[in-house]
Amino acid sequence: MSIEIKNTGVKKVVLAYSGGLDTSAIIPWLKENYDNCEIIAFCADVGQGEEELVGLTEKALASGASECHIVDLKEEFVKEYIYPTIASGAIYEGTYLLGTSMARPIIAKAQVEVARKVGADALCHGCTGKGNDQVRFEGCFAALAPDLKVIAPWREWTMQSREDLLAYLAERDIKTSASATKIYSRDANAFHISHEGGELEDPWNEPSKGVWTLTADPEDAPNKPEYVSLEVEHGRITKVNGEALTPYAALMTLNAIAAPHGVGRIDITENRLVGMKSRGCYETPGGTVMFAALRAIEELVLDKTSRNWREQVAAQMAHLVYDGRWFTPLCKSLLAASESLAESVNGEVVVKLYKGQATAVKKRSPNSLYSEAFATFGEDQVYDQKHAEGFIRLYSLASRIRALNANDVKSK
């Protein structure tokens, strides 16, 4: 077929490429709409699974890319993004551990690095115009490479459905294994997998068993609990069941241990950055165990005011990460605050895994502020309970004065 090539001045584009239907169609579309430009496919390996990477280079080249760069980011992703975020206590809207959100800044950073390496003058992503990811990616691009043009095909082209994309590729004799019958939209990395679409678009529908792919149904999980030990240094998991592991290996080990117990499933309706609500089902087995372990150590080592400050840091971090503001001064400051608080977050936790639950049942720390001698409900010789009387009188002084003033007003 005869295709008119538009003149836009773009010479070389680095595309965030997954090998899926969308990005497979984007490659020829870019050539047709951006000066027959050179397309460099870039894929970030953030632990989505080896099966997702098999044949990826061949597929990209067959679609029209001149190169395909697959960059292994797994260890960096866990060490530099997941661990600091978990240590901060960040959890979006009280439930979501930010698995997708945390992956976007490292992917964007690596994409920019590839663009610099190959001398590209534009970046491209396959995010839709309805979702959060377009904002996350482009926010990171703005912070890291404000000089590079950003192309977002879903905001430009007229295609609206999988059927449109399949027809587009067929017209150009580009083969794809994708079909029009895909039910769910999924996004996976080392930390979690998300599921959207299909029956989940109606919040009155219970997720079918076919939604979940990583964890066992808690109803079918073992009837006997499993206990896992985690050792923590400065807010980082360093050992699992006594074995020293790298951050990535620790996460993979905990995923393998916790998933058969159905740990880490959530079904939420969240507030998207772009204003609408969306429903998603998430599976985060290992991350849920890590989160529980760190919070358990914090209960031992953080005093009341420090714990209050950590909660404020966590709330702000959750929104910054969700909103794609990783590369901002505020995020840097909050990470520094979290790092400071984590200096005393050291110790060992035993987490009980049973029927979808991860519960910290044992914890100890060399920095523990808990004293059995002071906290005991039995007879003790170290705490004079009479001392509490003066504290209570001072603590409640403002309330006492307010009440006295109110009585004076009534009596006049």
UniProtKB/Swiss-Prot annotation:
SUPFAM superfamilies found in the cross-reference section: Adenine nucleotide alpha hydrolases-like, Argininosuccinate synthetase, C-terminal domain
Q: Which pathway, metabolic or otherwise, does it act in? A: Amino-acid biosynthesis; L-arginine biosynthesis; L-arginine from L-ornithine and carbamoyl phosphate: step 2/3
Say which family it is in.
Answer: Belongs to the argininosuccinate synthase family. Type 1 subfamily.
Q: What is its EC number?
A: 6.3.4.5
Q: Which residues bind ATP?
A: A16, Y17, S18, G19, G20, L21, D22, T23, S24, A44, G126
Principal subcellular localisation of the protein: cytoplasm
Q: What is this protein called?
A: Argininosuccinate synthase
HAMAP family, from UniProt? Arg_succ_synth_type1
Q: How does it assemble?
A: Homotetramer.
Q: Which gene encodes it?
A: argG
Give the binding site residues for L-aspartate. Answer: T128, N132, D133
A Gene Ontology biological process term = urea cycle
Single GO cellular component term: cytoplasm
Gene Ontology molecular function, alphabetical: argininosuccinate synthase activity; ATP binding
| Entry-linked InterPro entries | Arginosuc_syn_C (IPR048268), Arginosuc_syn_N (IPR048267), Arginosuc_synth (IPR001518), Arginosuc_synth_CS (IPR018223), Arginosuc_synth_type_1_subfam (IPR023434), AS_cat/multimer_dom_body (IPR024074), Rossmann-like_a/b/a_fold (IPR014729)
Q: Which UniProt keywords apply?
A: Amino-acid biosynthesis, Arginine biosynthesis, ATP-binding, Cytoplasm, Ligase, Nucleotide-binding
Q: What class of enzyme is it?
A: ligase
Any idea which positions bind L-citrulline? Y96, S101, N132, R136, S185, S194, E270, Y282
Q: Where in the cell is it found?
A: Cytoplasm
Task: Give the reaction(s) catalysed.
Answer: L-citrulline + L-aspartate + ATP = 2-(N(omega)-L-arginino)succinate + AMP + diphosphate + H(+)
**Signal peptide range in chain numbering:** none
> Is Transferase one of the keywords UniProt gives this record?
no
